[in-house]
Amino acid sequence: MKIFDVVIIGGGMTGLAFAAALQSSGLSIAIIESNPPKGFSLEQFSPRVSALNLASSQWLEELGAWQGIAQQRVAPYDAMYVWERDSFAKIEFNTQGLGVPQLGHIVENELIRQALWERVAQQKTHEILLRTESSSLVRSVSNADVQNPVDFLTALPRSLGVTDRNAILTLEDGQMLSAKLVVGADGANSWVRKQADIPLTFRDYGHSALVCHVQTEQPHTHCARQVFSSDGVLAFLPFAQENYCSIVWSLPPEQADYLLHCETSEFNKKLTVAFDHKLGLCQLQSKRYTFKLTARYARNFAQNRIALIGDAAHTIHPLAGLGVNLGFQDAKMLAQAILANEQLGVDFGEYRYLRHYERNRKVEAAKMLLVMQGLKDLFSGDHPLKKLIRGLGLSATDKMGLVKEQLIKQALGL
């Protein structure tokens, strides 16, 4: 049996950031991941992007991963413009008076993951357990090999058991791992959450999200834009190139499915109209993808020997791609709790030492879920009175400098 201090299930952005945060702890850590990154290419754009707020980019810099991101492709944005179609409702945010150069950065998820993977792979205290397509190959690669400076083993988790003193993982190849703490960073359909019998509250948003990349006739001027309509939300997130954007279009499933399969020319027309011609003619530049939107909230974020972070604990509506910031804050707080309790010489895997993390992050996730649901409900429906109230409310807020400043500071994570 292999013995570790922490075993992380899931090598996505949140799980890898959590591992990187423990780099100076001296703890032994294993990461179990079935789909390692294949390398990042500047030749093409990956479909999913995130809007990293200031707190997230600063933390990635502390972890030593931001340099790897910035050297590749990152798009800072310094303004955000939100409006409602066929209404006078609008609000605009910028960096004025904040003392920061930008509101955040638009970064492709695969680039964030690749940079974190390379950062974690350089650390000798981590062992990466991977399922490979070809065989049960085991090989060691020195840290001088920047391609794959990790140990590769074929592995997927098969069962999870918990005792008072440790958690026991059995892998599909028969290996057994022991850990003080197992961290579920394995996404919305978390295997860890299911194994731990943690109940899940969820709500179907009744929408699907369509994502793709487009070229716009007019430059985006490093402004993130979002338009609400009676049946959906459309966000344009600026890329580094001045006429390229990633879009996230939240729509009823039947509309999303139509837009997924319609002719490119038809898609371009409908997208341009839906965006109120704000950036002129929009032209599709990538494959289109859709995914169902569901809000999820785990009843427990922690229990004895088990903790959940990121989408394993909660998922929110992908308004403007902000969800990853919530997951990074989970990872940061859990890492801080582990490091603090390790210094005190206590068993950080016991539930009593995980309760502070759980209480704090459950509150923050619940607040974000309520805000996202509130925005969706606020802009749903096109009754004239409701549109008037929305218009008056947004326009009034747009003129309240102090209120806007507090709202944007909250979004920045300050």
What does each of the following model-derived ranges do?
Residues Q336-L414:
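C-terminal helical "tail/cap" subdomain of flavin- and related membrane-associated enzymes
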Residues F4-I31:
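N-terminal Rossmann-like FAD-binding beta1-loop-alpha1 element of flavoenzymes
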Residues Q44-Y81:
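N-terminal FAD cofactor-binding segment of flavoenzymes
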